Amino acid sequence: MENFPTEYFLNTSVRLLEYIRYRDSNYTREERIENLHYAYNKAAHHFAQPRQQQMLKVDPKRLQASLQTIVGMVVYSWAKVSKECMADLSIHYTYTLVLDDSSDDPHPAMLNYFDDLQAGREQSHPWWALVNEHFPNVLRHFGPFCSLNLIRSTMDFFEGCWIEQYNFGGFPGSDDYPQFLRRMNGLGHCVGASLWPKDLFDERKNFLEITTAVAQMENWMVWVNDLMSFYKEFDDERDQISLVKNFVTCHEITLDEALEKLTQETLHSSKQMVAVFADKDPQVMDTIECFMHGYVTWHLCDARYRLHEIYEKVKDQDTEDAKKFCKFFEQAANVGAVAPSEWAYPQVAQLANVRAKDDMKEGQKPILSSIELVE
C-alpha cells in the first residue's frame, strides 16, 4: 500500500478553499443546533417506525451514524431552506446513504420494476418501496421541474450503486467509464435541484439559473466530495471503486496523476461556479455560496471523513500549506464542530424499542364485545 500523499492533499485542499473564498457564516451556534435537532428528531422518528426497521434491516449503529452524517450535511449545506424541508431531505438522503453502504444484490427484486411502476403496485425492492412512500414528502417542497430532477437523479443513483456491487473500476482504455459511474451515483442533479424550494424560488422565473446550477453542481459537488473523502477512502477496502482509483485503472495512469486530474477539474469547476453566478440573481448566488461553504464545513467537521487526523498530523508543521490548512480547519471547527450529544437525541434504536413496547401493550389489551362498547 502506498503512503498517503499528505503534502499534495494539503495543497489541493488549500487551493480549493481559497478559490471558493471559504468563510462559513451560515448560522449562529444556536441556530445550527436548533436546525440540527429539528431535522434529526423528525428523521429519527421516521426510521424508528416498525416498517422501516423491518424492511431496511440495517445495523442500528450504522443507521444511527448514517442519519447523523446526513443531517449534518443537509443542515450545514441547505442553509436557506425551511426546517421542514431540511428534515424531509435528511430522510431522503439517509435512504441513499443506506443503499450506498449495502452489499445486497438488487437483481431479483428488480425483475418487475417497470411493470410494478406502471401498474401502481408497491415495488418488490424494499428500498424503493420505502423511498417511494417518502417521496411525496420531499416533492411537496418543489416545483415540477426540480421534482423531476430529484426523481431522475435518485433512479440514476440506484443504478450506480447496482454497478458498484460488482466492484468494477472499468476496463483499461475506457476513459469515459469513471465519470459515467461518478455522475450516475453522485446525486448531483438531485442535490442541485433540491436547493430551490418553491416557497423561496419561482422555478419558471429562475429557470435558466436553476438549470445552470443543476449542471454546474453535478460535477462540483461530487468532485469536492471525492477530494475531501480521498483520505478516508485511501486504505479502506470498501472504498476502492472511487473516481480517483478508476482514473488509475481506465486511463492507465499513476495515483498521483489521477489525483492531479481530479484536482484540476475540481478547481476549474470551483472557478466556474463562482464566476458564472457572480452577476446573476443575488438570491441565487447567495444560495449557491452558502451551500458551497456549508458543504466544505460539513466535510471538515464530520467524523466520517476523519480530516481531524490530518489536522493533528500537520498542526505543528511549518510549511505554508500546513499552516493554511490548519487555519481553515480551525475556522470550520469554530462554527461546525457540534457534538452529536447536543442535537442527535434520542437514538433511533431507543425510539424503535419504545414503539415496539407500545405495540406489545396495544396487542395485550382485552377485546371488548359490542355490548361492552355500547355500555
From Swiss-Prot:
Superkingdom of the source species: Eukaryota
Pathway(s) annotated for this protein in UniProt: Sesquiterpene biosynthesis; trichothecene biosynthesis
Upper lineage: Eukaryota, Fungi, Dikarya, Ascomycota, Pezizomycotina
Name listed for the protein in its UniProt record: Trichodiene synthase
Any one Gene Ontology BP term: sesquiterpenoid biosynthetic process
Name of the coding gene: TRI5
Top-rank EC class of the record's enzyme: lyase
E.C. no: 4.2.3.6
Reactions the enzyme catalyzes: (2E,6E)-farnesyl diphosphate = trichodiene + diphosphate
Other facts: Trichothecenes are sesquiterpenoid toxins that act by inhibiting protein biosynthesis.
Keyword annotations from UniProtKB, A to Z: Lyase
Protein family according to the UniProt entry: Belongs to the trichodiene synthase family.
One MF annotation (Gene Ontology) recorded for this entry: trichodiene synthase activity
Function: TS is a member of the terpene cyclase group of enzymes. It catalyzes the isomerization and cyclization of farnesyl pyro-phosphate to form trichodiene, the first cyclic intermediate in the biosynthetic pathway for trichothecenes. It serves to branch trichothecene biosynthesis from the isoprenoid pathway.
